[in-house]
Amino acid sequence: MKRDIHQWISDYGVSHQNPINKKIHWICVPLIMFTLLGLLSLVKIYNVNLAYLIIAFALFFYLRLSTPISIGMFIISATQLGLIFYIEMLFLDIHLIYIYLLTFIIAWVGQFIGHKIEGQKPSFFEDLQFLLIGPAWLISFIYKKIGIKY
């Protein structure tokens, strides 16, 4: 059975009930996304950075599930890519790969600490697509708060 966005969000939420784990996710999920895009932006394929290609595939995934979620993810992705571009312009002489990688690792350690507190394995152990659902899960809370149906 194909899952809709509500089923994905609900299934993801099962292992994200603990308030501390939720708070950790609000910090670590955006950091993981940002640092992953930062790392991917350093990889160029025919003068196109890999982050753009990965975002295109991710947005297609979101669009198949929910137009409002895909719009939110587009805005977040574009904002993060813009910030990454700005950082890369400012710090040409600094090896950003090490900063991105260290932050990426620290954010993942935070995620695993949150799941240890939760007493549940991360959702992506069940299905790798949950790695894309984490950011959408956060957006769903924002949308509910401001009354946007997704």
Please annotate each region the language model reported.
Residues 1-15, 19-20, 116-150:
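Membrane-proximal soluble regions of multi-pass membrane proteins
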Residues 9-30, 36-40, 59-69, 117, ...:
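Membrane interfacial helix-start motif at the N-side
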Residues 19, 45, 63-71, 87-94, ...:
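Membrane-interface helix caps and helix-loop-helix hairpins in membrane proteins
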Residues 37-51, 82-100:
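Helix-coil boundary and interhelical linker segments in multi-pass alpha-helical membrane proteins
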Residues 52-56, 70-75, 97-102:
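Hydrophobic alpha-helical transmembrane segments
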Residues 71-79, 126-128:
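Cytoplasmic-side transmembrane-helix entry/capping segments in multi-pass membrane proteins
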